[in-house]
A protein has these predicted regions:
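Compositionally biased terminal segments of proteins
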Residues: 1-294
């Protein structure tokens, strides 16, 4: 699979979404008891959170990789857990990529799996984290030898604001069909991670992911706002900050959010003004319906 760069919708194939979700399920299933400490984040999340679309809503464009976030309990636990993860990955045909949190498999459709963890006092955002012997003197190995995780600013919310999604998956390599549950990061954590990403890199798909989630939520942006506000994490200060940042990023057609959305979706530059207005309108409806979080 050619790795898209997040610049334009043309680089993505929504028909691969189910196949990638099945690959993610296969990896999580292979991790055994550690699966309880792993949450699926990233581009597969919107389609899993909104599996049934209202009439006229286009499917999410999908993604080209699988992003897994390790819980704080796993990150700060026995370093031997990471060796087990690495061993399982190798057994599934993966090898370390250009950085130690990215693992690749070249056969079949080709897969990239990236590992993340919540940022914390000893795990600054944007840095690769790998416990050392001094951090965990009882561990026999140094984070499984090679495997590491990239710390994300969204923090612990990524693994506490979660949804357990039940789906039927057709596992790869003719392993059969299985009904199983995936732990998926919830909508508030997803929005928080995406607005952090939008502000920190030039990947227009981040804006698309934000708009698609609130616009495609069953019932539309206002219903999304009411639904998200019912989540326990809604009143956390970092969520309030993230939602304010989303409001600002889409406050006008020339703001970074609206421009990024239009750049990603437009097939003709003449369509960009209309797409900018669409993004501004969707987010305006969403934030207007959000109740006071104080």
């Amino acid at each position: 699979m050619n790795e898209p760069d997040g610049q334009h919708v043309a680089g993505y194939d929504p028909d691969l979404a189910d196949q990638l979700a099945a690959e993610a399920a296969d990896i999580v299933r292979s991790l055994g008891f550690m699966a309880a400490h792993i949450v699926l984040i990233g581009g597969l999340v919107p389609g899993l959170l909104v599996p049934v679309l209202d009439p006229g809503v286009e499917p999410h464009v999908g993604t080209a990789d699988i992003d897994l976030c390790l819980s704080v309990a796993l990150v700060e636990g026995d370093t031997e857990a990471y060796e087990r993860i690495e061993t399982i990955l190798k057994g599934l045909g993966f090898q370390e990529g250009d950085v130690s949190f990215r693992w690749l498999r070249h056969d079949g459709i080709g897969l990239t799996v990236e590992f993340f963890c919540p940022a914390g006092e000893q795990r600054p955002a944007g840095r690769v984290f790998r416990p050392s012997h001094s951090d965990n003197p009882t561990g026999k190995h140094n984070f499984g030898g090679r495997l590491s995780a990239l710390a994300l600013e969204a923090g612990e919310l990524l693994t506490t604001d979660i949804e357990v999604v039940s789906r039927t998956f057709v596992l790869p390599q003719n392993k059969g069909t299985i009904d199983m549950e995936l732990r998926v990061t919830g909508p508030l954590a997803f929005l928080m991670a995406k607005i952090d990403a939008l502000r920190g890199r030039d990947k227009p798909k981040d804006a698309y992911d934000i708009v698609w989630l609130v616009e495609s939520w069953p019932g539309g942006p206002a219903v999304a706002a009411a639904s998200f506000a019912q989540r326990p994490a809604y009143h956390r200060p970092e969520v309030t900050v993230a939602l304010d940042s989303i409001r600002d990023a889409f406050a006008a057609t020339d703001r970074i959010g609206a421009r990024s959305y239009a750049r990603f979706v437009a097939t003709d530059i003449r369509d960009e003004p209309q797409l900018e207005r669409r993004a501004v309108g969707a987010i305006a409806e969403f934030v207007a319906a959000l109740p006071d979080s104080n």
